Amino acid sequence: MLGGAFLGIFSGMLSGYIPGLHPNTFFSEFDPTYLDREDVLTFASACSAVNVPLSKVESMFLGVPDDQASVAVLIPLQRYTIEGRAEEAARLVALGTLSTGFFAAVALPYIVKIVGPMYVASKPIIPWLVLTILALQTYDNGLRGLAVFSASSAVGYVVLSGPLDVASPLEAMLSGFYAIGPGLSCLMNRTSIPKQRPGKPAISGKELPKCGILAALAGCALGFLPGLGPANVVSVLTRLGVDTTERYLLVTSGIDAADAVSSIVALHALGNPRSGASVFIQRSVGDITYPEVLASVGVYLLVSVLGAWLLIFSTRVLGGVLSGARARVLTGTVVLGLLALMTFHGLGSLGTAIACAGIGIYALRSGVDPSLCTSALALPTALKLLGVG
């Protein structure tokens, strides 16, 4: 068990700290024969628990805009960074992750009972729900949002169902959208990250449980919607009262935690893996029992405390190091490294990453929510569920 935990923590740190490296890369390509059943469950839970908070480091420090006017319509985490308050944002993410994980764990016995009927009832309308959320998000981003949606969807459809030889489509697209694109934008703008200062978020005592419960419910529901992430449902969340940056960070970070917990439950209750971690578990050990669900969720909650601490600690360290020209040097190194990696994977992967980077840059410069780029995954998946294409 300890071996699986240490391996999971290490993998979660790698995928959290290295831009463009997704934990699904480990889950899809990692096939250790020396791990027993207990180690497999521990590895998957620990990797997810560390990656969920640490994945926010990339958003905080990579591709930060060069003026606060643009930050207001882009990634809320970057607003804190450009104001020198990255540690405060990290603490909000940590609070959202831990509080929602707690509420999801408390509700676990009830989730196990309702997840089956809920899935059966919602299965026929799942693709329509995905399309509705994408349409709502596109509407909120205007004509430029429509351009990003159309271009991303076209690239995703061609890459996922076309004749292109792309070694790792998910890695190539996500690297282009959320690492290479923002990195190049930062370098072109010669963006300077200001010195970060220590800080703690000022939130009321009633705010945390409200956001935690909302995130737990939204995370469980989001798990049924393939191709979408927490940021995609912001158009829905703002209509439910998530109308401040603090609430947004608490809820979206919490949704990630709830989604991780509910995906383990779904594997047990439905035999249907809904995440990279649960696919890895099913491939390695098959279906899991209810006691194993409890053990996996327990490991997730325990290790998520470490993940939250690592996020705050890393933000404090990086906030002192990545200021001025040093941030541009690191960003340039990351971009060159990812381009070299895509080249190693082949021309198909490199071309996909460059195309997605161009879309990502356009989204950033035109004030479009970057999460709309995930329509590259969500739309082809929804169409496939509808039997189209």
What spans do the regions from the language model cover?
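Residue-level signature of transmembrane alpha-helical entry/exit and packing/kink sites
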Residues: 1-4, 40-43, 145, 149, ...
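Helix-loop-helix hairpins and the membrane-proximal interhelical loops
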Residues: 1-37, 160-229, 235-241, 337
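Extracellular loop-to-transmembrane helix junctions
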Residues: 3-4, 32-56
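Transmembrane alpha-helix interface/packing and boundary motifs in multi-pass membrane proteins
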Residues: 7-23, 52-63, 136-139, 215-226, ...
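Transmembrane helix interruption/hinge and helix-loop junction motifs
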Residues: 18-20, 34-40, 139-143, 165, ...
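Generic transmembrane alpha-helix motif of multi-pass integral membrane proteins
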Residues: 27-32, 78, 131-137, 234-238, ...
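Helix-loop-helix junctions within the multi-pass membrane cores of secondary transporters/permeases
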Residues: 44-130, 232-335
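Membrane-embedded alpha-helical modules
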Residues: 92-192, 288-389
